């Protein structure tokens, strides 16, 4: 399903680049994903096989035509035709990742022992931007067991500068001696 969602997201991304733009399409597919997350009845209506595709498409047209770009509404209708509407939330996530990559942005998970003030957050973002060569968008998580320092996860790479890790390294060295 992830590969299928990625393929649909790539198609939507190309469509967005040719028409109204990445912002408009990103907001539109994000609105749909948020609606599916927030409204279980709408999600069930759209995803259940018991309701005819024609009825689903009629509701989508009524709700979204005039609110979203025509090509985006047509894209949603195609997902219904292909019985892939349950992937719309995944498609939205993949689309956002494609936009971030295209714009040179990287979402980075930063784990710290205590909350960071705004000045420190800005400093971390600037240093990560320099390190990654992309605009870093840090998502800070507070976990007291880190003890101090920070752990940074950027994609598949982890930079562990935590006090806990340094203490574990010292412990291993002492045990070897």
Task: Give residue spans per PLM region.
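Elongated, mostly alpha-helical coiled-coil "stalk/stator" tethers of large membrane protein machines
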Residues: 1-177
């Amino acid at each position: 399903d992830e590969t299928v969602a990625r393929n649909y997201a790539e198609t939507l991304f190309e469509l967005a680049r040719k028409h109204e733009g990445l912002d408009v399409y990103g907001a539109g597919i994000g609105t749909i994903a948020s609606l599916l997350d927030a409204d279980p009845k709408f999600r069930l209506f759209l995803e259940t096989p018991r309701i005819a595709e024609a009825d689903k498409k009629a509701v989508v047209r009524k709700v979204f035509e005039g609110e979203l770009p025509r090509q985006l509404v047509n894209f949603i209708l195609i997902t219904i035709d292909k019985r892939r509407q349950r992937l719309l939330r995944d498609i939205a996530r993949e689309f956002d990742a494609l936009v971030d990559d295209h714009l040179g942005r990287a979402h980075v998970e930063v784990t710290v022992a205590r909350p960071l003030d705004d000045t420190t957050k800005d400093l971390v973002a600037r240093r990560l931007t320099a390190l990654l060569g992309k605009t870093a968008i840090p998502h800070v998580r507070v976990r007291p067991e880190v003890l101090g320092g920070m752990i940074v996860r950027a994609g598949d790479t982890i930079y562990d500068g935590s006090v806990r890790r340094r203490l574990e390294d010292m412990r291993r060295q002492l045990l070897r001696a």
